[in-house]
Structures are given as C-alpha cells and as structure tokens.
Amino acid sequence: MSIKRSRLSPDESRHAAVEAARILLIEAGPQAVTLKAVAGRIGRTHANLLHHFGSAAGLQKALAAHLGDTITATIGEAVDAARRGEVAPRLIVDMTFDAFDAGGAGALASWMLASGNEDALDPVVEAIHRLVDKLVATALTPDLGDVIRDNTLMLVLLALGDSQMGGPMASSLGLPREKAREIATRSLIAALMAEAAAFAATKAAQAKV
C-alpha cells in the first residue's frame, strides 16, 4: 500500500521511507529495498529519498538501525517480564528468532555483508550492546553479568544462523526444525535460574543481618 501525502516533514519522510523499506524487506527480501522501490511505495521521488539517505546503502543502514532499535526494545521488555516470572523464556527466544527470520533481519545482514556494506550493521550491533549493558547493570554479581553476555551472544548467533540455514541443517541431521530454538531456550532457562538463585541467596543473607 502506497502512502501519499503532499507534504511531509523531513522526519516524517524518513520514517515513512524506513517503514516502507521494512515492509519491502519482509515481502520481497533485501534486494528489493531500493530507493526507487521505496519512493514508489510512499509517493515520493528517487531524488527525494536520495536527499534523505544519500544512497541505497544509506537507506539500508537506516533500516538496520530501525530494526535494531525495535527488536532490542521488544526483547528487553520481554526479558524484564521473564525475570519477574510473567512470561516464559521461550517467548524471548521466539521473538529473537522471528526477528531474524520472518522479520528479515537475518537476510538483511547477509545481504549487507555480501555487498560489502558491513558498516550498515553497526547500528544493530550497537543496539544489542546497549541492551546488554542495561541488563548487565542490573545483574546481582559480575558472574551473572558474564552469563548475560554469553547468552546474548549465543542467542543472536543462533538466531542469525537459523535464519540462513536452520531448515536444511536440521533436516540433514534428522532433527526437528525447532531444535535450535529448543537449545537456546534451555540455555536461557539456566541463566534465569542462576539469576533467581543469586537473588534468593542475597535476600537470605540480608534477612540474617
């Protein structure tokens, strides 16, 4: 669906373009995210988008930043809820895997790397880094901070790899398609249990004082 308005502010134009790029990414893959295609979606000219983003690579970098921010914000909220026992760890795993698979983040990352546009992935890495820093800051012990970093690395790399060749690999090994998600879930459950145990130990120690 095209978005057509005679006048948009610069911020509105950028937002509309990035949202159109996200939809194109999901519908047709990263190769479809071009200035011309996005311009057609929002009723703007190629020159207009060139002014805002500089190039197709600039548009893709803005899209990557948008995906990184939205994905980490959603996952961060889910992690907080899981720490409170309000949602199952599997939800966090599914959100992460779905973002890289159906959400197109994995395909976009591979496309950028293959086209030599590695810098465009910096916003995604930085968004994940900010989320990890936020989670580590609330860890009860340094060891738990390390567990958070380890699990973040595991979860992101598993989700990225699964989005690229999870289906063929699972099939060739005679494993269920969901196996990678199950592995990630087990690791995340162990991390949350370790955090809960540390919290209980801290509360018990405080009660003795």
Question: Over which residues does each language-model region extend?
Answer:
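Helix-turn-helix
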Residues: 16, 20-58, 62
